Amino acid sequence: MRGSAAAAAATVTRVAQRVVAPSAATPGGALPLSWLDRYPTQRALIESLHVFKGRADAAVAPAAAIERALAAALVSYYPIAGRLAERGDGGELVVDCTGEGVWFIEATASCSLEDVDYLEYPLMVDKDELLPHPTYPASESHPEDSLILLVQVTQFACGGFVVGFRFSHAAAPRPDGAPPPVPRHGHLHRLHRPLQGEVPGADGPPVQRVRGAHRQGVAVADARGGVRPGVPRPRVLRHERAPRAPARAPGRLLRQLLLHHAGDGGGGGGGGRVGERRGEADPGGEEAAPGGVRAVERRRRRRRGRPVPDHLRLPDAAGLRLVAAGVRRGGLRVGRPRPRRAAHQPRLHRHLHPRPPLRPQARRPPHHPVRRRRRRRRLPQRHDAPRLITERAHRPPPPTSPAQFDSFFFSFFFWVFSLLSLYARHGIHSP
């Protein structure tokens, strides 16, 4: 009840109003707007309220700190300090960077933020009293729709304050039309000043630091002003004769790929292997070879010339995460080439899509023969073939000829006389 009574008796008094200009000189000129922002409906002002807690014994008044920070921010955001104007014969809306500044109002409230429930809905204070609505003398005319930003700082009795914004929707930097986020109390005032002195070594030649530049053949900037060429880079990929595989290796060694990499220190570092699972040991001991030699390995099979299986391990020193299945689909084959089968010979599913052997307890899927396509019926090779087929399909049946009719009549009477003679011979009479 006490808070409601204090909120009902709360009054907001506007102490002063003035124009805050940028603290330094800003560039001028007119900035065009987009075709959407030039519509007359976009000249509305977006309103927002921002509530901040504070202390009653603050050394600096919030309005004074925000005013100084606003003047410093307008130097970088100088279009906000301008005015909206119409230029040209068509009256297109532009931002005139005049550098006049934004409208700033300072006000006080006779209650605390707790009395008005920190401006929660429903509002206990009229929002128009917390939003900036400037009053002009009769001799001056400043239409509000030409202003880009209006700010009002209302300080409450508890030390907290409310910042009210009215921002032009046409010049809003955000899609929703909201003003830029407000910094903390005196945030811009406490920032470090920019460096005024000269930067040491700014006029010297640029220094390019590349890790392992002598091994990669990168040109390095010289201190004498020239460019010192680097050492030529060795060949990236080289084929060597396959040595004899160790006795403990599970398969035979097909070939070796020597890949020079800056981070490959002989086997442990560098890139990984495609298709190798985490924690899988090196069966062939290729990583222990000098120079980071890594082998391509596959198990022995009865048939040669098959595609490389999915568990094939290739060197991936660049870290590209290659897909082993793509190597198989690409047509990489090992061993003697296998001649193609005849077209009439059936091919099974396991020949087209080989799979790794399953576990003993798993059930092997059945292999169905590949269905052959049905042969299409060929049309007669004539220029009027479609018309002939259509006429044959819709042609009515031919009428019965006289010869066919005579044959039918003769056979009918032959069977009738045969039955009559049979009845007369055996003396069969009807009852």
From Swiss-Prot:
* Active-site annotation: H169
- A GO MF term: hydroxycinnamoyltransferase activity
From which domain of life does this come?
Answer: Eukaryota
Q: Which UniProt keywords apply?
A: Acyltransferase, Transferase
Q: What is its EC number?
A: 2.3.1.-
Compositional bias, Low complexity, is annotated for 224-234
Record Gene3D superfamilies: Chloramphenicol acetyltransferase-like domain
Q: Where is the composition biased (Basic and acidic residues)?
A: 381-394
Which residue stretches belong to region Disordered? 220-247, 260-313, 331-400
- Regions of biased composition (Gly residues) lie at 264-273
* InterPro entries the record matches: CAT-like_dom_sf (IPR023213), Plant_acyltransferase (IPR050898)
Where composition is biased (Basic residues), the residues are 297-306, 335-380
- Name assigned to this protein: Acyl transferase 8
